[in-house]
Amino acid sequence: VLSAKDKTNISEAWGKIGGHAGEYGAEALERMFFVYPTTKTYFPHFDVSHGSAQVKGHGKKVADALTNAVGHLDDLPGALSALSDLHAHKLRVDPVNFKLLSHCLLVTLANHHPADFTPAVHASLDKFFASVSTVLTSKYR
């Protein structure tokens, strides 16, 4: 459960990302594909090379979904319901991949905003990504 302080940390951290959210989403995807190559199996139709338009496009989708979630921290299940259905029933993404992408997002954000990435912000963002992952996998059952 996200505390009031977590919600503040998340909103402030995401606010500092500003117009770079899509760029950071793509960078996190590239990092995931490189570090965890088995994740590429869910994107056989993608050019997963550095800087590809498809990775950039999907990175923007990831970032937009997270931006939506940040705007609905009190109702993540409602905000992410359609995405949960998509990933569980159509795409059938292995739930472990959400954790892998979450880790890559944390690394990407820490790399771009080291001064703002305090232990408290790190913990809050980690809880947020874990909450998003839980919601996205909730309809697998």
UniProtKB/Swiss-Prot annotation:
Question: Where does the chain cross the membrane?
Answer: none
Reply yes or no: does the keyword Hydrolase apply. Answer: no
What Gene3D superfamilies has UniProt attached to this entry? Globins
- Phosphoserine-modified residues are S3, S49, S102, S124, S131, S138
List-wise, which residues carry Phosphotyrosine? Y24
Q: Could you tell me which residues carry Phosphothreonine?
A: T8, T108, T134, T137
Keywords, A to Z, come to:
Acetylation, Heme, Iron, Metal-binding, Oxygen transport, Phosphoprotein, Transport
Residue positions binding heme b:
H87
N6-succinyllysine PTM positions read K7, K16, K40
Q: Name one GO molecular function term.
A: heme binding
GO cellular component annotations, sorted alphabetically?
blood microparticle; haptoglobin-hemoglobin complex; hemoglobin complex
GO annotation (BP), single:
hydrogen peroxide catabolic process
Tissue specificity annotation: Red blood cells.
Similarity remark = Belongs to the globin family.
The entry's protein name is Hemoglobin subunit alpha
- Annotated source species: Mesocricetus auratus (Golden hamster)
